[in-house]
Amino acid sequence: MSSPSFINKLALPNLATITQYPALTVGLSVFTFLLLVIDLCSNQALSQKFSLYPNAPFEFDLNRLSFYLLFHRGFTHWLLNVVGLFSPLAIFERTNGTVFTGVTLNVLAVTAGLQFCIVGKLLYPNTQVIGLSGVVFSFMSFMAYKEHHTTPVIYTFKYQGSEVSIPTLYSPFIFLIVCMVLIPGSSFWGHLAGISSGYLLALGYIKFLYPPSKAILFIERKLQTPINALRSLVVYYKEEEAIEQRGVSYNPLLSSDPESALNDIPVTTGARTNSFAGEGQVLGAT
């Protein structure tokens, strides 16, 4: 059973130490907020242009598959998604590198979006979705799969004299049901597609969608000057160091001390990045 302190660490970033957080995690939060402000000022013209609907890929409107996750219907929608995604994304980025994590976000958005559209052709042809919540569920299922090997049960409680256990592997479906009950207007099918994509990511079934590491290294070399300029603001995790860590055995979060699991991850200082916390062979809404 995970402790309350672990849950708090996952859910709430400490704004007082924001310069110690990964570049993409911070940048995505700021960028999506700016897009929200611009979208609201333009009477939601941007979100209408990039919202995902079931027929979009069949009409070759492919930009929607990548960009629908960047827009939100309002401040509350944005805040819930950013709070839910911030810490899981930071953990992933610290282990896998900044650019690689950006590619992962796009891969998850596209795979979840395609599933949503294929099912939607039959069940909800006129529904449109936007937002990061599908990716939140993707990282939830990704981590659930990784964690269940060492922590098969995430929570145990008593009900009418019987002990009930919640398997770690299937815990995302509990959150799916809770979200559906508490937020009736949320996209059940979009969240379900996000869960599916997270499992596919953890199992390595969508690794063919990733560019070779040489391409990422080439991009980083070309952007070395602006990357160095970011070091005083956020932590940039380079592909060169991340490559060495993807083969390291997974370091479970639930079975370790919650404080050290999230705090003992080195940060970048000066001109180089210190060693990563290993997360194993990893890859890489609504």
UniProtKB/Swiss-Prot annotation:
It comes from Debaryomyces hansenii (strain ATCC 36239 / CBS 767 / BCRC 21394 / JCM 1990 / NBRC 0083 / IGC 2968) (Yeast). It is found in: Golgi apparatus membrane; Golgi apparatus, cis-Golgi network membrane. GO terms for molecular function: serine-type endopeptidase activity. This is Rhomboid-type serine protease 2. Its EC number is 3.4.21.105. It catalyses: Cleaves type-1 transmembrane domains using a catalytic dyad composed of serine and histidine that are contributed by different transmembrane domains. The active site is at residues 133, 191. Probable rhomboid-type serine protease that catalyzes intramembrane proteolysis. The chain crosses the membrane at residues 18-38, 66-86, 99-119, 122-142, 164-183, 188-210. Its main location: Golgi. GO terms for biological process: proteolysis. It is an enzyme of class 3 (hydrolase). Belongs to the peptidase S54 family. InterPro entries: Peptidase_S54_rhomboid_dom, Rhomboid-like_sf. GO terms for cellular component: Golgi membrane; nuclear periphery. It holds the Pfam family Rhomboid. It is a multi-pass membrane protein. Keywords: Golgi apparatus, Hydrolase, Membrane, Protease, Serine protease, Transmembrane, Transmembrane helix. SUPFAM superfamilies: Rhomboid-like (SSF144091). The gene is RBD2.
